[in-house]
Structures are given as structure tokens and as C-alpha cells.
Amino acid sequence: FKKNNNIKIFYGDVSNIKLIKKIFKTSIKDKRKINSIVNNAGIRQRKKFLKLKTKDIENVFKTNFFSIFSIMQIYCLYSIKYKIKSSIVNIGSIVGENGFTELAGYSSTKGALKSLTKSVAVEHAKDNIRANIVIPGFIKTSYFNQFKQDKKKLYNWTINRTPMLRWGESNEVVSMIEFLISDDSSYITGSSFNVDGGWLSS
């Protein structure tokens, strides 16, 4: 890892449980509390349902679901042991809420993640651990310009399909995450929050 003032940055694969445990052990060693975690890692695979193989599904689930499952489990044990008032924010997707062509594997992981979030929220509310999930729509990221240029027809469809007639800005998702990890949301757990310009309501 690299050390920068009071910030420690770890690089690695989120499915590497040894790395995850190392992060928490380091926080204990440095006498720092991890009050919140945001699970944002994910991979997407486009493939027709009848072309999908079990291995394809396993690969997507490994990153999008099982790694987050393990991180949440380790974090809950950590929070309970050190009596930390904690907040977990998972990042879902509108693809996990509605059906999308050629995204059966990806959408399944996001649907499973939403259920996991709610279950953990209910089971560990008594331990002062909150868990919520943010459901972004189409958001402008580094992928945006390439998508707009290479898939103009699909891009125009997403604009027209979204009631607010635009893609979201990344800071609009970040603002929701900041709210959910703050004390301003101290009575909120087991909930999902759509940041999608009205997509799922239309």
C-alpha cells in the first residue's frame, strides 16, 4: 500500500480475502476505526442467455456478489468486536431491478446483492450496523464518451427512456452515498435508493 498523510491506499483484487483482512488488521494496528464501507466493485458481461455457461455466471458472481458477501461478513465481525457504529453502502444497478437483454448474469448478481443488503440490515440492526443499497441509473463515468460515440442509437434510447432526459452526474451518486454513511441517515437501514432520473418509476 501507499501512505499519504493520514490516508492509506490499498490496491488489489476485492475477491482476495487475505487483502481484505489485511486492511482491517492494519486499521486495528493503527488504532483507527472503519466506520463505513462502500462496495462499488463490479464487472459486467454481455452474452445471450442461451450462450451463457456456468463458468460465465461463476466469474461474474465471484466479483459482484461473493467478494462483497465476504467483505460484509468480515466488516460485521470487526464492527461487533470493536463496538463500532457502522454503515455499509452497496452499489446496485437498475439492471438488477428490470430485465435487460444479454445481461442475465450481471442482473442476477445485483438482484442477489439487494437481497443480501436487506437481510444483513435486519439481522445486524441490533449491533448498530446499518446496510443500504444505492441503485444508479445511467451515470456519466469514463465510459460515457465512448458509449455516446460508439453506440449512438442506444445512447439516444437511454436519454429518451429516462424521464429527466439526461444521464446522471457521478457527484449525484456520491451525494447519496455520503448521506447514507453519515449520521444524518442514522435511522435508515435495509433501504434501496434509486439515483436514476426516474427510470424505475416510469
What are these regions (language model features)?
Residues L52, G99-S107, S119, F147:
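Active-site loop-to-helix junction immediately N-terminal to the catalytic Tyr of the SDR YXXXK motif
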Residues M72, T109, T117:
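Active-site helix of classical SDR
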Residues L77, V122-K126, S186:
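Alpha-helical segment proximal to the catalytic Tyr-Lys
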Residues K48-F49, D56-F61, T158:
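Substrate-binding pocket helix/loop in short-chain dehydrogenase/reductase
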Residues S93:
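Residue(s) in the substrate-gating loop at a strand-loop-helix junction
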Residues N98, E178, T189-S202:
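Short C-terminal tail/terminal secondary-structure segment
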